[in-house]
UniProtKB/Swiss-Prot annotation:
Stated induction or repression of this protein's expression: Accumulates upon salt stress (NaCl).
Positions marked as site (Important for catalytic activity): 177
Protein's UniProt name: Phosphopantothenoylcysteine decarboxylase HAL3
Xref: InterPro entries: Flavin_trans-like (IPR036551), Flavoprotein (IPR003382)
Tissue specificity statement from the Swiss-Prot or TrEMBL entry: Mainly expressed in stems, to a lower extent in flowers, leaves and fruits, and at basal levels in roots.
Species annotation: Malus domestica (Apple)
Compartments in which it is found: Cell membrane; Cytoplasm
Sequence positions that bind FMN: 30-32, 55-57, 108-111, 142
SUPFAM superfamilies with a match to the protein in the record: Homo-oligomeric flavin-containing Cys decarboxylases, HFCD (SSF52507)
Length: 214
């Protein structure tokens, strides 16, 4: 077949059904562990298409220069600046539909409480409120030991577990405040390997390359 000849229907069908990289939506909320968000984005971008979301509080800790150049970071301002009139796309719905997997790392005590209570007062919590829970959703909490041990935290973790959210537990180490105890976010390498192993196992079981967004 020469370059001027049209592709056969069989070839076009194969091209349309070719595997694509998983689409990962990474999000950071307001914990000092957000200083590792750039490393997390780099880990995932080697394997998947990545888009990122940051709450206003998390921006105190995120070094934008540390993010991969091909990763777009969406903030609260983008939620409003991209919509002008009825019929325009809504950012939190667009991101929810685009992603195969949602990962919040770090998940602060405040954002955990909002999600558990169904609140949606910023870009990230609106994405969560609109999320399709048949798609994987991981959280990696990060907070002071006293906050992690608080009875409210236990209730909130139970609430999101009932939704099908997967917990990547915090670890015990020296915390940012100087205390030693449980509550530190798992390392980016652990978060990445946990999500990738889960996703690839799910793909093998289903026989699909990726779960297509709804």
């Amino acid at each position: 077949m020469t370059s001027s000849e049209p592709a056969s229907p069989e070839i076009e069908q194969q091209a349309n059904s070719a595997p694509r990289r998983p689409r990962i939506l990474l999000a950071a909320s307001g914990s000092v562990a957000a200083i590792k968000f750039g490393n997390l984005c780099h880990s995932f971008s080697e394997w998947a298409e990545v888009k990122a979301v940051a709450t206003r509080a998390s921006l105190h800790f995120i070094d934008r220069a540390s993010l991969p150049k091909d990763v777009i970071l969406y903030t609260e301002e983008d939620e409003w600046s991209t919509w002008n009139k009825v019929g325009d796309s809504v950012l939190h719905i667009e991101l929810r539909s685009w992603a195969d997997i949602l990962v919040i790392a770090p998940l602060s005590a405040n954002t955990l409480g909002k999600i558990a209570g169904g609140l949606c007062d910023n870009l990230l919590t609106c994405i969560v409120r609109a999320w399709d829970y048949s798609k994987p959703f991981f959280v990696a909490p990060a907070m002071n030991t006293l906050m992690w041990k608080n009875p409210f935290t236990e209730q909130h973790i139970m609430s999101i577990d009932e939704l099908g959210v997967s917990l990547i537990p915090p670890v015990t180490k020296r915390l940012a405040c100087g205390d030693y105890g449980n509550g530190a976010m798992a390392e980016p390498s652990v978060i990445y390997s946990t999500v990738r192993l889960f996703f690839e196992s799910r793909v093998q079981q289903s026989g699909n390359i990726v779960q297509q967004p709804v």
